[in-house]
Amino acid sequence: MNTASFQLTDKITLGDGHEIDPGVILGYLTGRDIADVALSIGSGARIRSGTVIYAGSTIGLGLETGHNVVIREENTIGDHFNIWNNSTIDYGCTIGDNVKVHCNVYIAQFTTLEDDVFIAPGVMIVNDPHPICGFCMRGPTIKRGARIGVNVTLMSHITIGEGALIGAGSVVTHDIHPHSVAYGNPARPVKYVDELLCPFDLVDRPYVDGLDVKARQAGIRRRL
């Protein structure tokens, strides 16, 4: 028997072809006063046990979650969004199409992830330069196709440029130019992604050849 919990049933819209595990909560009511408590999830969703999706968000086609995922209210999320185990999207975020958020990630309020962004495990995204103050909260903007490595911390009010790559363990405190490779604490750009070579000789330049393949696959998914 499916023991998923649907709160505010009349305000939840689920597209066709969804698969929802027992132990999922949809339409969880926030304690905040929000304008619209409707929850809309597009067709083809795969929502695994332990996931909690709050009332008041819009999510596109092909959502897939791992276990123990939290997606809070007032989020606008595009098609084919993947988010894996123990990750949290706080409220007020904007997320594009074909975005992947890996395990144990925290994405703070008012963060923007554009299309085709990849967030590796353990990434922490923050939004407040003056903790507890609350007057100037704004998360980073991560531009289309940028990739954030394992255990990176992204500070508030910054922009990660289109196609940029942030190395594992970095702390990013300022804007990163498009297509740059940056790492360190604080992270600094060291080269461009099209200069990187594949150490295994699988492709010549992984962030040129490899991304071309990925883009074609994403285009096929959109047409389907």
Task: Describe the function of each predicted region.
Residues 4, 10, 16, 21-22, ...:
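Left-handed beta-helix
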Residues 43-45, 144-146, 200-203, 209-211:
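Short, low-complexity, polar/charged sequence segments that are solvent-exposed and flexible
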Residues 204-224:
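ABC ATPase nucleotide-binding domains
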